[in-house]
């Protein structure tokens, strides 16, 4: 399983100050400490993950290496992004190469190449924007190649020297029993170069923190939590490696009228008790404008009316969802004396046929009597 980004583990931005890192780590350590979660394997793993992240980001040199090369820059067992397959092949390749005189397989002849880190960006949008789709401009914090040294990390006019530890290959070979294992060079972190006169603009890192502006197209029907991938718009690769990708995660603001459920929409429709009793025509809001529904006589609270096709056309759906209007019958307040007298007269007129006029009330009364009998 791939390791999570250390900044993501601690829940901080990539330009977080030391005190922010420490505060975030202490919070996680307190929450997931094994003494507070005895027998909880998941909490134990999260505690170890937070500890590992802080050990790297809390150290200035390790953090600089991590910012430039990712996990490979701080993992002595990394094989420059080749994965388990590459390390296994190199180990056996050396053995058979020594026996049969074959050449070494893999990328040991030059600096280690790393893919750029992926970036995440949370974008908050309205329900209307999600339904209709739109194009917007975003500013994404990212590490970019330094304009002064063009990513070399060396002061202009100087040249990085070949790493003395690995001879410029970016990797060293360690003998482990019968096997010769290739590892990322601990001195140059895979670059194959040593910087003796660092660039003053980036302190020798080769990268600077900045915001880059991008245009992002949000498709119609997108839902909360979905991600849009923008290929190649992540952080730049190292030593000619490919750039990472940008993932824009969508968060939809709460709407004052509608609640979304997949491609369907729900809303509460409050009506006066007179309309509920007598029926009538009502206008209801939809994302596309207004629609009319007929309220039949004797409508009760909780009744649901379905308007077909008035929901949202999802990203993968060929047709739109529906709109469900849930009726809430409103009881009048602050009545005048005259209005109260009218209602009392109305109440008295129901005494002879209460069961007929209020069947649900009669049913409820019968159930209560049965409960206490």
From Swiss-Prot:
Signal peptide: none
Pfam families registered for this protein in UniProt: DnaJ, DnaJ_C, DnaJ_CXXCXGXG
PROSITE patterns found in the cross-reference section: DNAJ_1, DNAJ_2, ZF_CR
Record key words, sorted: Chaperone, Cytoplasm, DNA replication, Metal-binding, Repeat, Stress response, Zinc, Zinc-finger
Record has Amino-acid biosynthesis as a keyword: no
Domain (J): residue spans on this chain: 5-70
Coiled coil segments of this chain: none
Record localization: Cytoplasm
GO terms assigned for molecular function: ATP binding; heat shock protein binding; unfolded protein binding; zinc ion binding
Cofactor: Zn(2+)
Gene Ontology cellular component list: cytoplasm
Chief localization: cytoplasm
Domain of life where this protein originates: Bacteria
Keyword Isomerase found: no
Extent of the CXXCXGXG motif repeats: 146-153, 163-170, 185-192, 199-206
Annotated binding of Zn(2+) 2, by residue: 163, 166, 185, 188
Record's comment describing the protein's domains: The J domain is necessary and sufficient to stimulate DnaK ATPase activity. Zinc center 1 plays an important role in the autonomous, DnaK-independent chaperone activity of DnaJ. Zinc center 2 is essential for interaction with DnaK and for DnaJ activity.
UniProt record similarity statement: Belongs to the DnaJ family.
Subunit structure of this chain's protein: Homodimer.
Function recorded in the entry: Participates actively in the response to hyperosmotic and heat shock by preventing the aggregation of stress-denatured proteins and by disaggregating proteins, also in an autonomous, DnaK-independent fashion. Unfolded proteins bind initially to DnaJ; upon interaction with the DnaJ-bound protein, DnaK hydrolyzes its bound ATP, resulting in the formation of a stable complex. GrpE releases ADP from DnaK; ATP binding to DnaK triggers the release of the substrate protein, thus completing the reaction cycle.
Designated name of the protein: Chaperone protein DnaJ
Organism for this UniProt entry: Bordetella avium (strain 197N)
């Amino acid at each position: 399983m791939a390791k999570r980004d250390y900044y993501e583990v601690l829940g901080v931005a990539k330009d977080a100050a030391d005190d922010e890192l420490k505060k975030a780590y202490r919070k996680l350590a307190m929450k997931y400490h094994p003494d507070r979660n005895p027998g909880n394997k998941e909490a134990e793993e999260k505690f170890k993950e937070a500890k590992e992240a802080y050990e790297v980001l809390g150290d200035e040199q390790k953090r600089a290496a991590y910012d430039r090369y990712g996990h490979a820059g701080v993992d002595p067992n990394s094989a420059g992004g080749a994965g388990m397959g590459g390390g296994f092949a190199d180990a056996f390749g050396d053995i058979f190469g020594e026996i049969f005189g074959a050449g070494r397989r893999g990328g040991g002849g030059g600096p280690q190449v790393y893919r750029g880190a992926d970036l995440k960006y949370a974008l908050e949008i309205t329900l209307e924007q999600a339904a209709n789709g739109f194009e917007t401009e975003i500013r994404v914090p990212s590490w970019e190649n330094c304009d002064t040294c063009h990513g070399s990390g060396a002061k202009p006019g100087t040249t990085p020297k070949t790493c003395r530890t690995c001879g410029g290959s970016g990797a060293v070979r360690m003998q482990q029993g019968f096997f010769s294992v290739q590892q990322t060079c601990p001195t140059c972190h895979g670059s194959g170069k040593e910087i003796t006169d660092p660039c003053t603009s980036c302190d020798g890192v080769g990268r600077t923190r900045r915001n880059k502006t991008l245009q992002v197209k949000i498709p119609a029907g997108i839902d909360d939590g979905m991600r849009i991938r923008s290929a190649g718009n992540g952080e730049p690769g190292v030593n000619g490696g490919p750039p990472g990708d940008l993932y824009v995660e969508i968060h939809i603001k709460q709407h004052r009228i509608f609640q979304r459920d997949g491609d369907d929409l729900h809303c509460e429709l409050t009506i006066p008790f007179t309309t509920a009793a007598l029926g009538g025509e009502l206008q209801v809001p939809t994302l596309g404008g207004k629609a009319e529904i007929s309220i039949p006589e004797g409508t009760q609270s909780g009744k649901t009316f379905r308007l077909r096709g008035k929901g949202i056309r999802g990203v993968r759906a060929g047709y739109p969802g529906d709109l469900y209007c849930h009726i809430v019958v409103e009881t009048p307040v602050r009545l005048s004396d005259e209005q109260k007298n009218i209602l009392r007269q109305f109440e008295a007129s129901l005494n002879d046929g209460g069961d007929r006029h209020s069947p649900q009330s009669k049913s409820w009364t019968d159930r209560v009597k049965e409960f206490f009998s």
